[in-house]
Amino acid sequence: MTASSVTSSRTGARVERLPLARFTTLGVGGEAEVWFVDNHEQLAEALEQPYRILGGGSNLVVADEGVPERVIRLTGRLAAADLTPDPDLSSTETVVTGWVGGGVPLPGLIRRLQKLGLSNLEGTVGIPAQVGGAVWMNAGTRYGEMFDGLHTLEIVSPEGMRQVTPDELDWGYRRSGIPRGHVVTRVRLKLRRSTPEAVLAKMALADQARKGQPKMKTPGCAFKNPGGVSAGKLIDEAGLKGTRIGNAMIAPEHGNFIVNLGGASSRDIHALLALIRARVGVPLELEYELWPEQA
């Protein structure tokens, strides 16, 4: 398949060879065969060959050479959100929604919940992710994370589909416990009834915490905080803020962010990550996902 050629799979999925840089918040990444799947039937076909799932493209560094696997994007029915309260599961204090697709953009979902006065997920405001990816890594901030508002998860793999509750998963800080290779296709949310004003006030707190973050193209935080210590503070103390390699730089505003100055390569990013690990005095666990994975 040549670049930008469009075909249709046997189930009607749109298949196109595209540069992955256009789908990532870093703006880096070579070409791959991208499958846009609208429903479970198309997804099942896409899973017949080696694959990767691409959501909002944050927390991701893709190699300049791209990846050989199919790259799957959830669209159509798998990017729709039914926020209608389930009358059998909701109460005067809580709401359990209908199904929310893994391809739903998280920022738009948070805005809808705020207008409805539904609380529990406002701490994730500003995270440029889709619901499936945000759930898969339990994205969040100091003010809240995705598992604060989950009732049921629908996950799919080549072996089939199953529904699980958060209690069935070994989830924690920036991890869901969902096995690698499984796709978060849909979730049902469990939310607390509040008011639009109260939810907006909590969103403002999380927004304020982001004021010191860079505005340039970035995957987000590079490393998880080790043992409750700020990774950004450790990088700052190592004197690395503002360090540049090629067209990538450790952000002057916040040491735990790497930014694309324009035309950065994945090699630039990897070189900065290696430099940080060499200079910081404690082991750092990467928060980014690397495509392909590094040995």
Curated annotation (Swiss-Prot):
Species the sequence originates in: Deinococcus geothermalis (strain DSM 11300 / CIP 105573 / AG-3a)
Classification via Gene3D superfamilies: 3.30.465.10, UDP-N-acetylenolpyruvoylglucosamine reductase, C-terminal domain (3.90.78.10), Uridine Diphospho-n-acetylenolpyruvylglucosamine Reductase, domain 2 (3.30.43.10)
The protein's name: UDP-N-acetylenolpyruvoylglucosamine reductase
One example of a Gene Ontology biological process annotation: peptidoglycan biosynthetic process
Pfam families according to UniProt: FAD_binding_4 (PF01565), MurB_C (PF02873)
Top-rank EC class of the record's enzyme: oxidoreductase
Signal peptide start-end: none
Listed GO MF terms: FAD binding; UDP-N-acetylmuramate dehydrogenase activity
Chief location of this protein within or outside the cell: cytoplasm
Keywords: Cell cycle, Cell division, Cell shape, Cell wall biogenesis/degradation, Cytoplasm, FAD, Flavoprotein, NADP, Oxidoreductase, Peptidoglycan synthesis
Annotated Gene Ontology cellular component terms: cytosol
EC number: 1.3.1.98
Cofactor: FAD
Family of the protein in this entry: Belongs to the MurB family.
Active site: 174, 221 (proton donor), 287
Catalyzed reaction equations: UDP-N-acetyl-alpha-D-muramate + NADP(+) = UDP-N-acetyl-3-O-(1-carboxyvinyl)-alpha-D-glucosamine + NADPH + H(+)
